[in-house]
A protein has these predicted regions:
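Acidic interaction surfaces
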Residues: 1-146
Length: 146
């Protein structure tokens, strides 16, 4: 247990013996959409993968109709034609283009997981600020709010 006192306040930090996710019992501001092969992270969702999630968010922003789908396909084709440096570079560019449009309607931050003798999540990468982070961390999803 840790205690910090700064009159008139006192802060006490102690281990939580109740192993219930606060996201299940408390109200929360954002929705966490995560993808991980071993852990159930974030809020429940039905997206197959991050591409499915980003496409749905994009279409929710521009419209779930034929015009929205054409705009999505046109954006993917334009971005793909500009990047010939490998599939990962192209995929990253498409993701960034979609997120730029999504940001017109949603505030969305990346979620990173640090998996080393326990789990920690952050909206900033752990690389450079945690030991072994270059091997034990990576982006697992997003948290968003409209």
């Amino acid at each position: 247990m840790l205690i910090a006192v700064n009159e008139p306040y006192a802060l006490m930090v102690q281990p939580d013996d109740i192993l219930i996710s606060p996201r299940e019992v408390d109200e929360h501001f954002g929705t966490m959409v995560c993808f991980h092969p071993r852990y159930a992270l974030g809020d429940h969702h039905n997206y197959m993968d991050k591409d499915d999630f980003l496409r749905e968010m994009y279409l929710d922003t521009v419209g779930h109709d034929e015009a929205g789908m054409k705009r999505y396909e046109r954006m993917v084709n334009i971005v793909s034609s500009r990047f010939r440096h490998g599939p990962k570079t192209e995929e990253r560019a498409i993701d960034e283009a979609m997120q730029k449009v999504i940001s017109e309607k949603y505030l969305m931050l990346p979620l990173y997981l640090y998996d080393h003798s326990g789990l920690a999540m952050s909206t900033e990468s752990f690389s450079g600020r945690a030991s072994h982070a270059e091997w034990d961390c990576g982006q697992v999803g997003w948290i968003y709010v409209s």
